[in-house]
Amino acid sequence: MQVDKEILRALNQVLGQALIAINQYFLHARIAKNWALSELNEKLYHQSIHEMKWADDLIERILMLDGLPNLQELGKILIGENVAEILRCDLQLEYQKTDIIKNAIALCEQQRDFVSRKLLVKLKDGSEEHIDWLETQIELVTSMGIENYTQSLLDS
C-alpha cells in the first residue's frame, strides 16, 4: 500500500520518540531499582515495555505502508540524577512526544489515513495517561517533600 511520504516521515518521528522513551524509562527504572525504590522501578519498567509495544505497532504500520522504519534516529535521552529530576525529565519527554503525535494525527486527518490516525490516537491517549501520572507524582513531591515522597517508594 503506497502512502504519502509525509505520513511515513511523521510515523517515523513518533517511532523515534517511542525509542527514546523505551531507553529513558528503562534506565530510570534501573536507577530506581538501584536506589531500592521498587514502586518507581516497577512503574517505569512497565512504561518502557508499553513504549516497546507501541514502537512495534508503529513499525508494523510503517512496513504495511511500504515504508522503512527508522530505528537509527535516536534523539537525546534525558537522565535524572535524583527522583525529582527523573520525574521532570520523563514529563518533558512525554510533553514532547505528545506534541509530535498530535501533529502526526492532524497530518493523517488531512491525508485521510484513518488507520494510522487510529493507532496514533491510541498512543496519544497512553501518553496523556502517563503525563497525568507524572504530574501527580511531581505534585506529591511538592506537597510531601522529596524525603517523604522517596521514603514512600522504598522497598519494604
At which residue positions do the language-model features occur?
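Iron-associated oxidoreductase/ferritin-like identity signal
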Residues: 1-156
